[in-house]
Amino acid sequence: MTNLNLPSLFVPLVGLVFPAIAMASLFLHVQKNKIV
C-alpha cells in the first residue's frame, strides 16, 4: 500500500459520504419537526 493512493481514495469518499450524511440528517430533522 503506497501513500500516493490514499488521497485519491479519500477525496471521493469524503465528497460522497459527507453530503449523504448531511442530506440524511437534514431529512430526519425535517421529518421529526414536521415542517413540511
UniProtKB/Swiss-Prot annotation:
Function: May help in the organization of the PsaL subunit.
Superkingdom of source: Eukaryota
Protein name: Photosystem I reaction center subunit VIII
SUPFAM superfamilies from the UniProt entry: Subunit VIII of photosystem I reaction centre, PsaI
One annotated Gene Ontology cellular component of this protein: chloroplast thylakoid membrane
The UniProt record lists the keyword Transmembrane: yes
Annotated organism of origin: Brassica oleracea
Family per similarity comment: Belongs to the PsaI family.
BP GO terms, sorted: photosynthesis
Pfam families, A to Z: PSI_8
UniProt keyword annotation of Nuclease present: no
Keywords in alphabetical order: Chloroplast, Membrane, Photosynthesis, Photosystem I, Plastid, Thylakoid, Transmembrane, Transmembrane helix
Protein topology in the membrane: Single-pass membrane protein
Subcellular location: Plastid, Chloroplast thylakoid membrane
Residues passing through the membrane, by range: 8-28
Broad class of where this protein is predominantly found: plastid
InterPro entries assigned: PSI_PsaI, PSI_PsaI_sf
PANTHER family registered for this protein in UniProt: PHOTOSYSTEM I REACTION CENTER SUBUNIT VIII, PTHR35775
